[in-house]
């Protein structure tokens, strides 16, 4: 059966006054072209721009090639495409698709690539909460944490009647001698033990942790922070917090009593009969 090709061109948002189109008539191919749709999604919610706004750039503006917004966008889209290792960016810094996503197609200086290499991105990731002489990019942890919840709230046109916050800790296996490396008996490997909080498909919190702690460590504090932020927009919302996860019931009670509106604590399905409705 003869293959029928669609010769139409599909246009995307221009970058630096250059048109960006997708064609299906052959030529040089890329396996990452679908990422252009990811870029369109980002522009709809402004994720990268808002994430970049959580950083402070203390570098001399006239001397830099890669802005914080470009660095953050390059790293976010790189991870989304499966390029988790910074060393990959020594090649990806020349990739036209990633350049389109980052919004930077050409370098200002002749001796630079359009995007950053691993060393520059490493300095971004090793930044601190405060600017120092040797750390010129700082991040605001509270703003980054709040951004997850802001995106969740904005994803709802109308507040739902009830939401369920699902807390979970899982293993992030390590294959080298990374800082904070510990062996975890349950997972039978060296790993980190990150804490995640979801509401359905929405990620509300992601906390990197070492594996030498209890799985529930910090869970109540994170839940309290998220609930307080949700309450500013949805003050009458019923919030369900599963009572599993190894969190001490007494600590859950403390969290519940600290809320002005209805908060609902329940055990796992195997103990559903013992759930409690708290005010």
Which sequence ranges carry the predicted segments?
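Dynamic "connector" segments at or just before major functional cores
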Residues: 1-214, 218-233, 259
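Polar helix-capping/helix-linker motif
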Residues: 95, 249, 269-270
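A structural signal for short, well-ordered beta-strand segments and their strand-loop junctions
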Residues: 164-166, 242, 264-266
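Acidic/histidine-rich, metal-coordinating catalytic segments
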Residues: 168, 237-247
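A short acidic (Asp/Glu
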Residues: 176, 249-255, 274-278
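Short beta->alpha junction loops/turns
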Residues: 209, 245-246, 269
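Catalytic or ion-translocation cores adjacent to nucleophile or general acid/base/metal-coordination motifs
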Residues: 217, 224, 260-279
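Active-site loop/helix belt of alpha/beta enzymes
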Residues: 240, 248-262
